Design a protein with these regions (language model features):
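Charge-rich, low-complexity N-terminal segments
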Residues: 1-62
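A generic local secondary-structure boundary/capping motif
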Residues: 2, 28-29, 101-103, 112
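Short solvent-exposed loop/turn micro-motifs enriched in small/polar/acidic residues
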Residues: 22-23, 107-109
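Short acidic-glycine loop/turn motifs at beta-strand connectors
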Residues: 33-35, 81-84, 117-121
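Hydrophobic residues embedded in beta-strands of well-ordered beta-sheets
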Residues: 37-38, 74, 122
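Phosphate/ribose-recognition catalytic cores of enzymes acting on nucleotide-derived substrates
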Residues: 54-99, 105
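A hydrophobic, small-residue-rich beta->alpha segment in the mid-to-C-terminal subdomain
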Residues: 108-150
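Cysteine/selenocysteine-centered motifs that mediate thiol-based redox chemistry or coordinate metal-sulfur cofactors
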Residues: 149-166
Length: 166
């Protein structure tokens, strides 16, 4: 496969804060493009070898399958152990709807995170950080609605949560 062909299957993901300022960016391989979403795969290459968030420990080399939506106030990261492929869980960021193009995804993070363990247990993170943000009432309403939508999807085992245990 020529480099140009491989390059066509990649894009750059930009994580922005609530003010639209870049916090982090990385390259990801496009897995699927839908009408209102893109699914990509990336390796965790954090600034540290290991990052703990709630019950989940991210390690350099972990595999992230990520869904970004331009019509939903969240994204979903499926986290697999880079060494053995085991499902670590799902990390869902509450965000404004993503901006999607052929080469770039941008998502404005609103601090709230929904972690889903492999057994389906749900943990909400960073409520205090979210409450301290200077957000509009509409943004707050949409963010809390997104948390509820994710919880409902997990309980119903709607894809990609259909592989969770009980």
């Amino acid at each position: 496969m020529a480099f140009e062909e491989l390059h066509d299957n990649w894009l750059t993901v930009y994580k922005l804060n609530e003010r639209g300022e870049e916090v982090w960016h990385y390259n990801a391989e496009i897995i699927e493009n839908g009408a209102n979403f893109v699914c990509v795969r990336a390796l965790f290459v954090g600034r540290r070898d290991e990052v703990r968030s709630g019950f989940m420990v991210f390690r350099r080399g972990d595999v992230m399958t990520e869904w970004f939506f331009n019509d939903r106030w969240y994204n979903i990261f499926r986290v697999q152990d880079g060494a053995n492929g085991a499902l670590k869980g799902f990390y869902c960021n509450i965000t404004r709807p993503a901006q999607l193009s052929e080469e770039v995804v941008t998502a404005e993070d609103l601090a709230l995170d929904v972690l889903v363990a492999p057994n389906g247990e749900i943990t909400l993170l960073d409520e205090e950080e979210f409450e301290a943000m200077p957000l509009s009432a509409e943004d707050r309403t949409q963010a809390w609605a997104a948390v509820e939508q994710l919880k409902q999807r997990v309980v119903a085992r709607t894809p990609p949560f259909d592989e969770l245990g009980h």
